[in-house]
Amino acid sequence: MRFRLGGDEHQVRCDFIAGCDGFHGICRASVPGAALTVYERTYPFAWLGILVEAPPSCDELVYAYHERGFALFSMRSPAVTRLYLQVPADDAIERWSDDAIWDEMLTRLTALDGWKPTVGRIIQKNVTPMRGFVAAPMRHGRLFLAGDAAHIVPPTGAKGLNLAASDVLALARGFKAFYESGTNEWLDRYSDLCLRRVWRAQRFSAWMTSALHRFPDDSAFDRRRQVADLDYLTNSDAAMTSLAEQYVGSPSEIAFESVGLPEQPTGKFRLGASVG
């Protein structure tokens, strides 16, 4: 591997390269085009996100389905909240004053029981495009792609970090087996094992996105179908269990103890929802 640092050219000889350099990194771009198949879906909307100096007014995430578009309330710390609005894909942050953001946020997030997010000073705001992306296979020779270098999910399902951690766990097991026993078994299985999990997350994230967002070409039929989906989800134990399992994340197919890590923790799942 050759690179320049401080104006000087350097060379590093290594057994493997872990491509954990993100969606815009050089690792995936270094793979010959014919060796990769790219699957991609770009959504016709984006998320306008804000960081706010205000204590969370709820200890749960709140997903809001509203006739004006999706909104999300989340927590960053005891003193900072993070909120999102669905906006057009070509929207620019410069078009949104702080007052306009709060007007729209309160319109979409104020619940029937009177709950609403605490208004505070906006300390950061940005617009993030929505896409689903997978590059396969996730291995080319001795280069292994991991995390956003190999896949992007729409953030509605909150799966991006989970997938990256699962990739690295699988890769760690492969490296451990190679250096301890000289076997390539887990490295050879890396791409197939990870992609199975990636496509499950893509399916869930696409469903969450489709269920909660307004699409430009939505008909009255589509809107009523979305409401029926949410009605079923919030009134069926089976549906809520399925959502919780997928949202929290299915157990990794890689045993944690196999790479010297603590056993995978378990936790309860709770979800708040507001339908406007």
Feature map (PLM): residue ranges:
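A sequence-level detector of short, solvent-exposed, charge-rich linear segments
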Residues: 27-38, 42, 46-50, 67, ...
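Conserved mid-domain beta->alpha element of the FAD-binding
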Residues: 18-19, 126-207
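C-terminal helical "tail/cap" subdomain of flavin- and related membrane-associated enzymes
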Residues: 158, 173-276
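Hydrophobic transmembrane alpha-helix bundles
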Residues: 18-26, 79-84, 102, 116-127, ...
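Well-ordered, non-transmembrane segments within structured domains
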Residues: 72, 133-142, 267-270, 276
